[in-house]
Amino acid sequence: MAGQPEVQVSRLLNERGLSSFHVKLLIWSFFIVLIDGYDIGAIAFAAPSLIRAWNLKPGELGPVFSASLVGILFGSALFGWVGDRYGRKAALIGSNLLFGIFTFAAGYATNLHEMFWLRLLAGVGIGGVIPNVVAINAESAPRHLRATLAIIAVGFVPIGGAI
């Protein structure tokens, strides 16, 4: 618009420094990534019950463990693109919704085949979280804190797995 000064967002971010917005964003990131980390590790604790309930041999559950990791691979690429195209917030909402629906449904799986596909699809949602949490924290941070905030945000995954 004519007559109004041009605003450079990157300059404003760098001048402002760390704010309560960044702390709140990091707290939200903590909970989102913590839940994803928990889900990645939770199947290991459910395995003995599933083996007994479905009369499986221990090795038969291996593909279910791998399914979520394969889903994470595809989810990272898919939701990374969604975040670039439609925004990080939309990508985080979509990936968490996908993850939540299929993780909930996995609780009602009646056989190995169902569990495999539900864990694969939940993995797609989980995979979408990490690149977008890293990006949203880095993009909103002052230049000198970008790497630090991004690493802190993604560092919560193992904490979730340890719970």
Regions found by a protein language model. Name each.
Residues 1-163:
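Transmembrane-helix signature of 12-pass secondary carriers
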